[in-house]
Design a protein with these regions (language model features):
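N-terminal lobe of the biotin/lipoate ligase/transferase fold
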Residues: 1-136, 141-142, 167, 192-196
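A short beta-strand motif that forms part of the nucleic acid-binding face
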Residues: 51, 149, 176
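Short, conserved beta-strand/beta-arch hydrophobic-aromatic motifs that form part
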Residues: 56-57, 61, 142-162
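A structural signal for short, well-ordered beta-strand segments
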Residues: 91-93, 133, 145-147, 158-162, ...
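Non-catalytic surface loops within mature trypsin-like serine protease
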Residues: 97-99, 149-151, 162-164, 189
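Intrinsically disordered, low-complexity acidic/polar segments
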Residues: 100, 154-156, 169
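C-terminal accessory segment of soluble enzyme catalytic cores
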Residues: 166-217
Length: 217
């Protein structure tokens, strides 16, 4: 398996949605290989399918979001509500699970394993919590996962807190879970963590877990 990596820097959420849509169609048509898009977003709250009809997990008013410069978008991914912003590494794998990887549960667990390995590369012991999606250190979420799969081609993906301003998570109930916290690599390590190093570690871990040969890096 070959995967083409794109490291795009800071990209507005709406622009990234359009890019994903185009890449998904290209992948379905076999015009491109599997893709791994790595980027950051300006401050934005996104609503998964669980949150589109019930926004009670968005705690801030529209006026407060506007005052803080935080956008709000409905998405087609699974899950509830989450926050994206600068200092958070967002990954959008556009991967064709045909013909022998048609297992949504396995795919999500594999994404978790990628992020567990990334954390380990920085000396952090992260893991899973029973019944919950994502990657955790104790009772604090380090990385969130929310995916969409259409005709077995994936989109959306994961968000790893590197140097995220965690105060923005006070605007929401992250992933609809009220009794857990959030954390970041920088908070756990007590030092700055270069985003480029995290991107490189993510590419390495993704290649290992998915048995992929990265190109374009």
């Amino acid at each position: 398996m070959v995967i083409e990596v794109k490291r795009l820097g800071l990209v507005p959420y709406e622009q990234a949605l359009a890019l994903q849509k185009q890449l998904v169609e290209d992948r379905k048509a076999q015009r491109i290989p599997d893709q791994l898009i790595l980027l950051q977003h300006p401050p934005v709250i996104t609503l998964g399918v669980k949150a589109r009809d019930d926004r009670t997990h968005v705690l801030a008013s529209p006026d407060e979001l506007s005052r803080q410069g935080v956008e709000l978008f409905e998405t087609g991914r699974g899950g509830d509500v989450t926050f994206h912003g600068p200092g958070q590494l967002v990954g959008y794998p556009i991967v064709d699970l045909n013909p022998d990887r048609r297992d949504v549960h396995r795919y999500v667990r594999d994404l978790e394993e990628v992020l567990i390995q990334v954390a380990a590369s920085f000396g952090i012991s992260a893991g899973r919590q029973a019944g919950l999606t994502g990657v955790w250190v104790g009772n604090e979420k380090l990385a969130a996962i929310g995916v969409r799969i259409a005709r077995w081609v994936t989109s959306h993906g994961f968000a790893l807190n590197v140097a995220t301003d965690l105060r923005h998570f006070d605007l929401i109930v992250p992933c609809g879970i009220r009794d857990k916290g959030v954390t970041s690599l920088e908070r756990l390590l007590g030092r700055p963590v270069p985003m480029a190093e995290v991107e490189t570690a993510t590419i390495t871990a993704f290649a290992a877990v998915f048995n992929a040969a990265p190109i374009g890096v």
